[in-house]
């Protein structure tokens, strides 16, 4: 089973914020695949189906961003999902709004949700789809920025990136991730 994990924060107040770009991609995939989420005992929302002949699961941790690993590790253990079958989708300050970047592995880059996953999974070697949200201007605090909503100028580019990231995830269901990475990072 492939597990797609979108990082974000639960609750209405965080919907459509920069930090919830991962949730937005997962929601787009659920819409495309016509599946609904159920709350799990692992402190997350999960939906699963068979797509292109492969079992897939979508996960939105409800632990808040900084504790995402507390949801994902037990879920992986329960369903016997190998780290090679996990793809994590999240926001990235170091990419401009609307840009996506796929990676096979890497450090947290200062992202607390990724730090939590690295800690709980015991490895940095999991696949990622990063959604660019850009950096704050005018000395705005990073916390306020990532928890803020996209500006009108950013919105179209980011929504296009959400769709493109969902396309990459769909392709990764049956295509080797390195090949998907080469195509979508071009």
Curated annotation (Swiss-Prot):
The keyword Nucleotide-binding does not apply. Its main location: cytoplasm. GO terms for molecular function: peptidyl-tRNA hydrolase activity; tRNA binding. One of its GO terms (cellular component) is cytoplasm. The record marks 91 as: Stabilizes the basic form of H active site to accept a proton. Pfam families: Pept_tRNA_hydro (PF01195). The active site is at 19 (proton acceptor). It is found in: Cytoplasm. The keyword Hydrolase applies. It is an enzyme of class 3 (hydrolase). PROSITE patterns: PEPT_TRNA_HYDROL_1, PEPT_TRNA_HYDROL_2. It catalyses: an N-acyl-L-alpha-aminoacyl-tRNA + H2O = an N-acyl-L-amino acid + a tRNA + H(+). It comes from the Bacteria. The record marks 9 as: Discriminates between blocked and unblocked aminoacyl-tRNA. TRNA binds at residues 14, 64, 66, 112. Its EC number is 3.1.1.29. Keywords: Cytoplasm, Hydrolase, RNA-binding, tRNA-binding. One of its GO terms (biological process) is protein quality control for misfolded or incompletely synthesized proteins. Monomer. Belongs to the PTH family. Hydrolyzes ribosome-free peptidyl-tRNAs (with 1 or more amino acids incorporated), which drop off the ribosome during protein synthesis, or as a result of ribosome stalling. This is Peptidyl-tRNA hydrolase. It comes from Geobacillus sp. (strain WCH70).
């Amino acid at each position: 089973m492939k597990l797609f994990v979108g990082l974000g924060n639960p609750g209405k107040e965080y919907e459509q914020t920069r930090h919830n770009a991962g949730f937005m991609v997962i929601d787009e995939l659920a819409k495309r695949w016509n599946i609904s989420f159920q709350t799990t005992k692992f402190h997350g929302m999960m939906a699963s189906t068979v797509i292109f002949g492969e079992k897939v699961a979508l996960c939105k941790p409800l632990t808040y961003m900084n504790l995402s690993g507390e949801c994902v590790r037990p879920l992986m253990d329960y369903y016997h999902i190998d780290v090679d079958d996990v793809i994590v989708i999240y926001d990235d300050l170091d990419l401009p709004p609307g840009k996506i970047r796929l990676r096979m592995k890497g450090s947290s880059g200062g992202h607390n949700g990724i730090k939590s996953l690295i800690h709980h999974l015991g490895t940095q070697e999991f696949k990622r789809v990063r959604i660019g949200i850009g950096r704050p201007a005018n000395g705005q605090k990073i916390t306020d920025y990532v928890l803020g909503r996209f500006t009108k100028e950013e919105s179209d580019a980011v929504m296009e990136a959400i769709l493109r990231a969902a396309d990459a995830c769909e392709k990764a269901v049956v295509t080797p991730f390195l090949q998907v990475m080469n195509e979508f990072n071009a």
